[in-house]
A protein has these predicted regions:
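Sec-dependent N-terminal signal peptides
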Residues: 4-14
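A domain-level signal for the mature, folded cores of soluble proteins
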Residues: 19-115, 133-217
Length: 217
């Protein structure tokens, strides 16, 4: 399944002044299966969800790396020391991704991986995303997207097998393994779960293959 939803959720407190405009916490890090899962950041034997959230924060803030959210539905929830203010006509939040222009083509776009962003105000002031109202930031394709979309991934019997997915639109397929990335694609700190289900917004299939390779990577 090539189309992804990369969700980043932001939990914002009420502060009298801005200590830092950059997120300072990773509350949840739950990637869907994928080729860079367990690598960005690296999972090591014994790492649980809390350890992986700490590694995700370190990767993004201290080392300047990207983290993998896997296939559709994977997400990370981060917290800020300041409130994200909606200023009309201004960009209120900046998120850096790994989109780039292909060196083999003059066409701009390259490896573009759009995502969905949701924000919430920590109205109960407990620092965790419970009982707060979440708002999806409407991007350019909001009206063309499938809302209330759902995908379930089924853990295979072997980490060497492709991972089956099924959605609530009657579609199914596989997250295929690649020879370039041989580690387990299932999040290993979630190895006790036989199924991972994600819900959210599915962006439309706008990507166009303008390459010349017979078997594009």
């Amino acid at each position: 399944m090539r189309k992804q939803m990369i969700a980043l959720a932001a939990l914002c407190p009420l502060t009298a002044f801005a200590v830092s405009p950059v997120h300072n916490r990773v509350i949840d890090y739950v990637p869907a299966p994928g080729q860079f899962v367990n690598v960005l950041p690296e999972w090591e034997d014994g790492d649980d969800a809390e350890a992986m959230a700490a590694k995700a924060l370190q990767y993004m803030t201290e080392e300047g790396y990207y983290i993998s959210l896997g296939a559709w539905g994977g997400y990370v929830t981060v917290g800020f020391e300041r409130t994200i203010v909606n200023v009309p006509g201004k960009r209120d939040i900046y998120i850096e991704g790994n989109a780039f222009q292909s060196s083999q083509s003059s066409t701009k776009g390259g490896n573009s991986e759009p995502g969905v962003v949701m924000v919430a105000y920590d109205i109960n002031h407990n620092g965790i995303p419970d009982g707060n109202e979440w708002f999806e930031i409407a991007g350019s394709e909001y009206s063309k997207s499938i809302h209330n979309y759902e995908v379930s991934y089924i853990r295979p019997a072997s980490d060497n097998d492709d991972i089956m997915w099924m959605d609530n639109q009657g579609n199914s397929g596989f997250v295929n393994r690649m020879p370039f990335h041989t580690q387990p694609y299932w999040p290993q700190w979630l190895s006790g779960r036989s199924k991972l289900t994600f819900q959210g917004c599915r962006l439309p299939d706008n990507s166009v293959n303008e390459g010349t390779a017979d078997d594009p990577y």
